[in-house]
Amino acid sequence: MRGKFISFEGIDGCGKTTQVKLLEEHLKKEGYDLLVLREPGGTRVGEKVREILLDRENLIFPVTEMLLYASSRAQLVEEKILPALSKGQMVIVDRFIDSSYVYQGYARGLGLEKVKIVNEIATKGLFPDITVYIDITPEEAIKRRQGKKADRLEGEDYEFHKKVREGYLRLVKDFPERFILIDGMQEVLAVHKMVVKAVEEYLKGAKV
């Protein structure tokens, strides 16, 4: 039986990476066999692409950015995700295709159709079964990142992150059957409890 595929999404600073780690710990205690990955990265090739994408010294044009993310994603799908799912493992990914929709398609202005075409090739049409979207305001994200060294995308201005959030909220509205919206403005453990509740409800329903 094919394993379940869960992705986490949100603007930079929303706390999704922390929530991925907490969910991983919880599900392992519950006995689930799972593989946790990140984007861009997760493979040797992907991690090299990640270095290029996040380096603030690099001037990267929107189309280049889209293709670099897609190349990392293609490697991750072929090398890690599809083999794990075929073995029945649960796969949790910190960012996936929706990041490209909102960052390159919406915030960079490339358009969703262009991003969709490229990424359908990269992922072989693979989509997460559910996507946990951690929602916070750009103001809160900026506050949380104060004092921390920002990468190339984190260092974008307020308007960019505002567009990213708008893009995510549009996806949540357009694909309610896949997206789970979590209020990320609360403290870490409160958010974790909401994530666990939502994921466990999905997993129980998927077993029926």
From Swiss-Prot:
SUPFAM superfamilies: P-loop containing nucleoside triphosphate hydrolases. InterPro entries: P-loop_NTPase, Thymidylate_kin-like_dom, Thymidylate_kin_CS, Thymidylate_kinase. It comes from the Bacteria. It catalyses: dTMP + ATP = dTDP + ADP. It holds the Pfam family Thymidylate_kin. ATP binds at residues 10-17. Keywords: ATP-binding, Kinase, Nucleotide biosynthesis, Nucleotide-binding, Transferase. GO terms for molecular function: ATP binding; dTMP kinase activity. One of its GO terms (biological process) is dTTP biosynthetic process. CDD domains: TMPK. The keyword Transferase applies. Its EC number is 2.7.4.9. One of its GO terms (cellular component) is cytosol. Belongs to the thymidylate kinase family. Phosphorylation of dTMP to form dTDP in both de novo and salvage pathways of dTTP synthesis. HAMAP family: Thymidylate_kinase. This is Thymidylate kinase. The lineage of its organism: Bacteria, Bacillati, Bacillota, Clostridia, Thermoanaerobacterales.
